């Protein structure tokens, strides 16, 4: 069997990759026209604490179907870890149709789209994750989606939010 990488290492690698891409994007930035930043809700001082995916699936679908949906989310996560992004996207698209209020589904689907280079779709799902959780956790990836679309104002807004949410912020 294939050994799994520890979760923090993979998460750090993805964040580092996104931060490097944004640094490259700063060099590409053209002072020409850029679409206006989206009108976003302001984030509270701390993220919203939501129930686990298992609870949300069971609330939305019932005990039996909720348990199956949780298993499918696990399958999608394994496909993502193995870089089988098409498989992960297929599973997650089925889940998001029925359970768009489960942040783990939105987050993973946004990351799948990001890794596939589907910037607009990735941004859509990660924005939904941001609104639902009030978290800045995926801001580097979301900002890179906007950088790829040359939406510089959105990139700037996200970096300001991330800076303001940082524990070392003044």
Segments and roles (model prediction):
Residues 1-65, 70-71:
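Basic Arg/Gly/Lys-rich low-complexity intrinsically disordered segments
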Residues 58-65, 93-100, 127-134, 161-169:
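Solenoid-like repeat scaffolds
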Residues 149-156:
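Coil-to-helix interface segments in alpha-helical RNA-associated scaffolds
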